[in-house]
């Protein structure tokens, strides 16, 4: 989590602000506001180089783990889907740790619905494969989707 946040905010949030401006964004989500606030000052090139070295070590560790497996199956997030309007708490960011962990590798993954909470909100599973094995991630995602019923529209309430 620290590596991801360090890289995402290494420029003091200027890159995010630039993208928001290019997109014509007038209002941002509370989590984006929190990330921009946490950005602080731009970090040094040496600091960023150290973070990328940690990413390389992390990728090597993950690749060693995957020597014995074709795919990792894991939750998408540490929490089930949130009800609309409840994700404004910046303290929820650690719940995205499963997604962030695999985003750091840059490796292929597929996310599919595997069920639903009692309220009808979807629960997902992600399949993450080795580098350059999109075919494996997509095949596993396709199999899971077929076996578990695929996309089902959640109930919409006002």
Predicted segment positions?
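Structural helix-boundary/capping segments
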Residues: 49-53, 60, 104-158
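Generic structural marker for isolated residues within well-ordered, non-membrane alpha-helices
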Residues: 16, 98, 141
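An anion/phosphate-binding loop that grips the pyrophosphate of nucleotide cofactors and donors
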Residues: 69
């Amino acid at each position: 989590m620290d590596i991801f946040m360090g890289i995402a905010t290494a420029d003091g949030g200027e890159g995010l602000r630039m993208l928001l401006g290019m997109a014509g964004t007038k209002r941002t989500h509370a989590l984006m506001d929190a990330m921009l606030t946490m950005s602080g000052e731009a970090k040094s090139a040496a600091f960023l180089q150290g973070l990328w070295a940690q990413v390389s070590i992390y990728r090597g560790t993950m690749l060693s783990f995957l020597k014995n497996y074709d795919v990792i199956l894991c939750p998408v997030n540490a929490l089930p889907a949130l009800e609309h309007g409840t994700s404004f708490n910046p303290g929820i960011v650690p719940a995205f740790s499963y997604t962030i962990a695999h985003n750091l590798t840059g490796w292929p993954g597929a996310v599919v619905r595997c069920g639903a909470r009692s309220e009808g909100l979807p629960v997902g599973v992600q399949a993450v494969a080795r580098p350059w094995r999109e075919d494996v991630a997509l095949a596993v995602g396709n199999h899971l989707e077929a076996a578990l019923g695929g996309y089902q529209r959640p109930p919409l309430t006002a």
